From Swiss-Prot:
Gene3D superfamilies: 3.40.630.30. It is an enzyme of class 2 (transferase). Belongs to the acetyltransferase family. EctA subfamily. NCBIfam families: ectoine_EctA (TIGR02406). Pathway: Amine and polyamine biosynthesis; ectoine biosynthesis; L-ectoine from L-aspartate 4-semialdehyde: step 2/3. GO terms for biological process: ectoine biosynthetic process. GO terms for molecular function: diaminobutyrate acetyltransferase activity. The keyword ATP-binding does not apply. This is L-2,4-diaminobutyric acid acetyltransferase.
Length: 178
């Protein structure tokens, strides 16, 4: 994500330079910050171990956005063993300070450009019906790649223990152009 000039006060037409974010592979040292970002948002918070483990074993298919040394966004993802042409996005987290700037889409696009994702033709994620932001993001991804976004039922709420988890629907974007 490159630095962009933004007008923050239209009356005075003041221009400011927004920070240049670094989009890169995560390291195990980033795992705790990813966990903290998930915990401070409305995301399902997995154990801190999950984030550290994803950084160690799935760094080729995960990405972090940093403002200096601070993690301000991340994606945890993997290539399912039975779907080698698909990148499954487990979680996307964006700090409140970065929301509405297109960082989620930038992270996905940077991720699918990687050598490890050269055979990826589809992006999949599961999204709850109430998560309108993620639904909009995946539809925007499809539009930006001029491809389809198919939505299908995946995990019903009955599969989750307790009664506090919504149904998860699969969003499948693709085929992506090679």
């Amino acid at each position: 994500m490159s630095g962009k000039n933004e007008i923050i006060n239209e009356k005075e037409a003041v221009m400011v330079q927004t920070p240049v974010l670094t989009l890169t592979k995560p390291t195990v040292e980033d795992g705790a910050a990813m966990w903290q970002l998930a915990k401070s948002s409305s995301l399902d918070t997995n154990s801190s171990y999950k984030y550290i483990m994803m950084c160690e074993y799935f760094d080729d298919t995960c990405i972090v956005a940093k403002d200096g040394d601070e993690v301000v966004g991340f994606i945890t993802a993997f290539i399912p063993p039975k779907q080698q042409d698909t990148l499954f996005i487990w979680q996307i987290g964006v700090a409140a300070s970065q929301r509405g700037r297109g960082l989620g889409l930038d992270l996905i696009n940077k991720l699918i450009e990687r050598e490890a994702c050269k055979d990826i033709r589809y992006v999949e994620a599961t999204v709850t019906p109430s998560n309108k932001a993620s639904q909009a993001l995946f539809r925007k991804l499809a539009r930006s790649h001029q491809t389809d976004c198919q939505v299908s039922s995946c995990f019903s709420e009955q599969l989750f223990p307790g009664d506090s988890h919504e149904q998860e629907n699969t969003f499948r974007i693709g085929p992506l152009r090679s």
